[in-house]
Amino acid sequence: QECIRLEIQIENEVLVPRTDMVDIFKKCVASGKKVSLITDMYLPACVLEDILDKNGIVGYQELFVSCDAKQLKLQGLFELYKEKVQDEKYLHIGDHKIHDGICAGLAGIDYILISSGVGLFRKTGFAECTDYAQTLEERVMLGLVIAKLFNSPFVETTDEGRMALQEEYDYGYGICAPLISKFAVWLYETIKKEAVDNILFAARDG
């Protein structure tokens, strides 16, 4: 039970809502559209409802979770959704070609595929960073960069794998901050290992 509690706590701390998609969700709800959420997830609906609420994702009609339904999207979760909702037309939005695309289509549901943050990341020159992220600390840092720079599924990338950073802050967060953070960690570990008492920082004015 303690492990489960800790896992849920960590999920709450690290999950990042995709702002543009949350905005679209809210506009759909505000316009009176019937919106349901469907997910393949090992956590039960009661836990997910709390996480969604904390991220301002409210107003949906139903939450269909494979963990509770004992059915994945591949195994009939979409059919269960249609049976419960009973409408003439359905549109599903997701980021997985098979689970959100093919499975929805086979269930007679129209679908729109968006790119996941990781999917967008892999299309850019940043993708090479995964070869160098070996430690947990480095992978966490990379995850933070992906969550920030590729939060929107509408980020523009070129065929050459280039992307346009929208603000100066993004340059600092995605490029400078990881370098400085890595240096700070290295410096701390070196000081501890060498039992250094004093550190002198040289600075140049101007």
Predicted features by range, described:
Residues 17-24, 179-193:
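A short, well-structured juxtamembrane/interface segment
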Residues 2-36:
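Short, acidic loop-to-helix structural element flanking the phosphoryl-transfer center
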Residues 22-25, 101-104, 115-118:
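Hydrophobic/aromatic interaction determinants used to assemble and anchor large protein complexes
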Residues 41-45, 70-71, 97-99, 117-120, ...:
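Short, solvent-exposed loop/turn segments at secondary-structure junctions
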Residues 36-89:
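Substrate-recognition "cap/lid" segment bordering the active-site pocket of phosphatases
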Residues 1, 119, 125-189:
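Extracellular glycan-modifying ectodomains
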Residues 36, 40, 196-203:
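Short glycine-rich phosphate-binding loop at a beta-alpha junction
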